[in-house]
Amino acid sequence: GEDATVNLLEQKVAQLFNHEAALFCASGTMANQIAVKAHTQPMDEIILDKTAHIYYYETAGYAFHSGVSVKLVDGKNGIISAGQVLENIQPNFDWLPKTSLVCLENTSNKGGGSCYDVQTIQEIKNVCTDNQLKLHIDGARLFNAIVSKAYTTHRIGELADSLSVCFSKGLGAPVGSVLIGNATFIRKAR
C-alpha cells in the first residue's frame, strides 16, 4: 500500500497475531474470498461447517472467484472437529476435487456465538498439517472468542495459515477487516 497509516495498521495487526504480514480489506467477505483464492487452485475443494459465513452469506463467492467447491460438515453450533475434517478429506482420485483448505468461523454467527477451544483448533491444525491442507480462520468476531476462551492473539495466530479479523464487529469501527498470514501469502493476496 501507499498509505503510511494503513501500512502501520497492517504491520501492527500482523505482529499482534504473530504473523509476518497483513492486508487491509474493505470487508470480512472480501478478506475471506481473497484467502480462499490465495490458498486454492480452481477445482479444489474446501471443508467448512454448513453454517459458515463463507458458505451461507458470501453468495458462492468461492465458486465464482476461485473455482472451488465446498464440502459441508455438520458441526455442533457451527463448530467442527478434527475427526470431521479427517473424514471429509477427498481421497486422491483423478476425478474428485483435491481438498486443499479448511475454513473455521470463530465465533460462529449462525452457531449463536459458539467459540472454538484452542485444543480443538490445534487438533484441526494437526490434521491439516498431516494432510497438506491450509487452515484459514474467519475471525469476524475473533476478539470475542479470544476473551471468551482466554487464549492469546499469538496462540491463535500460530495455529492458522491465515486469519481474517473484522474491525466493525468486536471493535465497532465503521468499516474494514484485515487478512493476516505469512509474507508470501500476503504478496499473493495483494
Label every PLM stretch briefly.
Residues 1-190:
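Conserved PLP-enzyme active-site core in the AAT-like
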